[in-house]
Regions:
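A short beta-strand motif that forms the metal-chelation/ATP-contact edge
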Residues: 51-56, 123-126, 175-177, 243-258
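Active-site nucleotide/adenylate-binding loops and adjacent lid/helix of ATP-dependent enzymes
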Residues: 4-7, 74, 82-170, 215, ...
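Protein kinase-like catalytic core scaffold
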Residues: 123, 163, 186, 233, ...
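Conserved N-proximal alpha/beta basic substrate-recognition cap immediately N-terminal to
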Residues: 7-110
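A long amphipathic alpha-helix within ATP-dependent nucleotide-binding catalytic cores
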Residues: 198-247, 259, 266-275
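Anionic group-transfer/hydrolysis microenvironments
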Residues: 58-59, 128, 167-168, 176, ...
């Protein structure tokens, strides 16, 4: 197979660029070892015509447009340009709501509003569009005054829309998947995080490891991924003290740092299944 491989721009990988690049390089290496013609394309460069597949971690609009154009010519993109765009916070939140997938209660906010709506505290204020690339894109909010200040900061940064999600007490669990929901050999892993790219996990504290249905989480995660369209994905959920599962994040092609070796092998399997 002729495969174009595109890494993630460092600007889209805050505090995670080394881990993202490690997965990218390992996957490219394994593709080459299997005899596939793998061409690395820097973010911003043209994608050559005639590719059978495109493995990418990009999130830049220009490259997603170029990937979409090659998809129309017959290239299989993993993840597709459309699916990657669906991982924008506002979009995946809407998709999960439509699919009936449990999330913390949330409210859509306009940062230009002069009257703050009545909300329950504490909660999380999140930039609505795109992915988190700045520490203030997701903020823990304990009071109305903190909310007003945080909304003002987003407005100053030129961010027009935000999402306010109620805080759910419980354990944060990270999950990772590769494959389709109907794939018998799909890859799924989960673990309790110790530290994320911005340290948000510290708010929930040391995991209590509340019991929950792991099979239900896997089913829910792949249902969400299928609705969004991603075949390589990661995410975060809250496990409440009574074992309820609340999805709080879904993202395209995470670094899989805890499972890099086996994840790279699974990604290669997925890519080569497209021929």
């Amino acid at each position: 197979m002729k495969i174009a491989a595109i890494p993630r721009a460092s600007a889209d990988s805050p505090n995670m660029s080394e881990k993202d690049m490690a997965l990218f390089r390992l996957t490219v290496e394994k593709l080459s070892e299997e005899g596939h013609c793998t061409v690395v394309i820097e973010d911003g460069d043209e994608i050559p015509a005639g590719c059978d597949a495109i493995f990418h971690m990009t999130r830049t609009a220009q490259m997603l447009d170029r990937i979409a154009a090659r998809e129309k010519e017959g290239a299989a993109a993993i993840n597709s340009a459309a699916a990657t765009r669906n991982c924008s916070r506002s979009t995946f939140t809407e998709i999960l709501t439509r699919e009936g997938i449990e999330q913390p209660p949330y409210t859509l906010l306009d940062t230009s509003m002069s009257i703050t709506p009545v909300l329950r505290f504490p909660g999380w204020l999140k930039k609505s569009d795109g992915w988190s690339s700045h520490p203030d894109d997701v903020q823990y909010i304990a009071t109305k005054e903190a909310l007003i200040n945080a909304i003002g900061n987003l407005r100053t940064r030129g961010i027009a829309k935000a999402i306010y999600s109620e805080h759910i007490e419980g354990d944060i669990v990270k999950f990772y998947g590769i494959g389709r929901h109907d794939d018998r050999d799909k890859f799924f892993r989960l673990h309790y995080p110790t530290d994320g790219k911005f340290g948000y996990e510290k708010i929930n504290g040391v995991p209590h490891k509340y019991p929950f249905d792991e099979e239900k989480l896997q089913t829910t995660a792949f249902k969400a991924a299928a609705a969004i369209g991603v075949e390589i994905f990661g995410g975060d959920c809250i496990i409440s003290p009574d074992g309820e599962i609340y999805i709080i994040d879904i993202n395209d092609c995470p670094s899989f740092s805890a499972y890099r070796e086996e994840a790279a092998e699974e990604i290669v399997r997925l890519i080569t299944s497209k021929k």
